[in-house]
Amino acid sequence: MKNGEILEVTVKEIKDNTVIGLVDEQNVYVRAKDISLLEPEKKYFGFLYLNRHGEWCVDTTIPKASLKSFGWGKVETVDHSSGVFVSIGLADKDILVSLDDLPDNSRDWPQVDDELIVRLERDNKDRLWGKLATDEDLISGGFISFDHKFKQNEMVSGHVYHLGKTGVFILLKEGRFAYLHHTEMEENVHLGQEITGRIIGFGAHDRINISLLKNAYARIDDDAAMILAAIKFTPDKKLLLSDSSTPKEIKDKFGISKSSFKRAVGHLLKQNLITSENGYLKIKS
């Protein structure tokens, strides 16, 4: 018998909540979502594993994460000396994703309750390890879907499955790849984290670009919003005011100081909402 095999077990005895089975003439514990459905002397297919007590068990609910397939695993424990332990659905066994397969900086590691997509790997000591999915694994594993039609500024959610040099890669709940550049996040994002962001573009290879920042209009302050509204409601979408305007002209128009005006205009320029040309402030087309 080997860890992670999917094989046939014969139920030998059912007593209270304990089910004993037989695999290759060796006793094993049999796990099931509903043991009342198990019958003595009947054969069942299941997933063979050594539990945390070193006992052989067969779970008749075969986990999606196996030696041949990828599935979701929920982080149960973080151990900075070894890695993170994830649950793949087994009642008394978590799977270790080694620190060798995790980011160098532990601040980028998954945290408890985060989710990872893993496949199992068995080493020469018959131990099971969790291996993280790549783009190719997600495609071949059937995680990708093109059913949903996304729109600009739509809010989407997903889990981080890979950290890149300039940003993070996400698998959306709708089954599409997404990318989050580091300039589009306000704080560190880590592996396995569930995030919700706004679509800001559509990149190559059907990958969606998202942002965790509020859109430009939501990020401007009251002075900037007042100036932007004034420009928008002029007939030709331009306002005869600029850095060269006098404090009195600015005060008469907006009731704010010139320094406040310059700060607000600078914010609007930085957000690419307006332009400043020939003494006019204009809505950027």
Locations of regions flagged by a protein language model:
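Single-stranded RNA-binding regions, centering on S1/OB-family and related RNA-binding modules
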Residues: 1-285
